[in-house]
Design a protein with these regions (language model features):
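Compositionally biased terminal segments of proteins
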Residues: 1-147
Length: 147
């Protein structure tokens, strides 16, 4: 298995566990920085497109809210802003609670939907939809008020 992964992927890291019950971990990708290592189980079955497993939108919402709960970055608000078109705040909070039942704190998440202190210093993502940071912030505040 190790030889195959190292031959097929530019970056392949094989975990060095000596405890048999822990199994083996493999991190693969193009570079170390582009590789993903994730241990939490998904709350929805993964999407499989052309043999590539991907997280569902619901899964991504839960993960983004988890980041927001600890003061999100500009890109997180940008992503969530797009998702507010199809999901209510209650739906988003329910997904976060389902995925992170032990750390879920709806009050903190709601408060952090309008806490842009950390994000304001980030560079603006390149938005192909022509959105602007100041508008996104106002929309996020309104989203929570409507919530």
């Amino acid at each position: 298995m190790e030889k195959f992964l190292q031959a097929e992927f530019p970056y392949a890291s094989i975990g060095d566990y000596t405890v048999a019950g822990m199994g083996k971990s493999y991190i693969i990708g193009h570079t170390r920085l582009q590789s993903v290592y994730y241990t939490d189980p998904f709350i929805r079955p993964a999407l499989v497109v052309n043999g590539i497993r991907m997280a569902t939108v619901e899964e991504i919402i839960a993960m983004k809210l988890d980041i927001i709960s600890r003061a999100g970055r500009k890109k997180d608000f940008w992503d969530l802003h797009e998702l507010t078109q199809n999901y209510t705040l209650a739906q988003m909070l329910a997904l976060h609670e389902e995925r992170y039942p032990y750390s879920h704190d709806a009050k903190t998440i709601k408060a952090n939907f309008s806490n842009f202190a950390k994000a304001d210093d980030d560079i603006d993502p390149e938005c192909l939809l022509g959105k602007h940071w100041e508008v996104i912030k106002m929309d996020m505040i309104d989203f929570v008020k409507r919530g």
